[in-house]
A protein has these predicted regions:
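Extended ligand-binding regions for polar small-molecule ligands
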Residues: 5-7, 48-57, 115, 139, ...
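Extracytoplasmic small-molecule ligand-binding "clamshell" domains
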Residues: 5-87
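Ligand-binding cleft/hinge of the Venus flytrap
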Residues: 36-40, 51-60, 124, 139-158, ...
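Short helix-initiation/N-cap motifs at beta->coil->alpha
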Residues: 63-75, 138-140, 154-168, 203
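A ligand-binding cleft/hinge motif common to bilobed small-molecule-binding domains
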Residues: 88-96, 144-146, 167-168, 172-202
Length: 227
């Protein structure tokens, strides 16, 4: 799951401001199993519940704000959201654009395609023979594709949409997080004819706050106590 940033708006304790407002605004995209809507239209998922547990400990409500992930650091630095908590991969670029907590989960980027085709593609070089590979713009999947030298990529607005491109046949494959691939492909899912094969990069998830925010250390401390 790393772009432009604006001037930092943190002028006082983020923790104090959040507690005074009574709300923690969390920037997310719809990304199962981390953040997605249930049948009632309510946000649920691993990161959703984790964020709500943190909010409860802070004594504030949690508001989930859908953002364009490709513009996430602008959303953060402008104050539109207080943090980014959406299966966000910790990267060197991210550390320059924001203040990120210690890792709370491990993951990997994987290539998803139709089960009937997966046996034909066993290496990253094989993937270069595909017509198109869908990726989420600004995601770890995009960086993994770049690192693998894949130029046959098409950008989607989210990982869920990248997966839809494969289901519909608009793309031959997609690169998404292992957590999503496990939750949304194979038997018992809506994409039973899809599977994943090649793992591209291992990664760790963290939560991003504004540069200089005291929420980073506070959240790292609270996460350690919750895990």
């Amino acid at each position: 799951k790393e772009n432009n940033k604006k001037e930092d708006t943190t002028t006082q304790s983020d923790l104090a401001k959040i507690q005074a407002a009574g709300v923690l605004k969390v920037g997310i995209t719809e990304y199962e199993p981390m953040n997605y809507k249930d049948k009632k239209g309510e946000w649920t998922g691993f990161d959703t519940e984790f964020a709500q547990a943190l909010g409860e400990k802070l004594g504030v409500k949690v508001e989930f704000v859908e953002i364009n992930w490709n513009n996430k650091y602008n959303e953060l630095s402008s104050g539109a959201v207080d943090c980014l908590w959406n299966g966000m991969t910790i990267t060197d670029e991210g550390k320059k654009a924001a203040s990120i907590t210690n890792a709370y989960a491990e993951n990997a980027q994987v290539v998803v395609m139709k089960q009937s085709e997966v046996g034909k593609y066993k290496t990253t070089d094989d993937l270069k023979n595909l017509k198109s590979i869908a990726i989420e713009g600004g995601s770890a999947g995009e960086k993994a594709a770049q690192a693998a030298g894949l130029t046959n990529t098409v950008v989607s607005d989210s990982q869920a949409l990248a997966l839809t491109e494969v289901t519909s046949g608009s793309a031959d494959a997609c690169i998404i997080d292992l957590t999503m691939a496990n939750a949304m492909t194979g038997e018992g899912t809506g994409n039973k004819n899809l599977t994943y094969s090649i793992k591209l990069e291992a990664e760790e998830y963290g939560i991003a706050f504004r540069t200089g925010s005291d929420m980073t250390a506070k959240t790292t401390e609270m996460l350690a106590a919750m895990m």
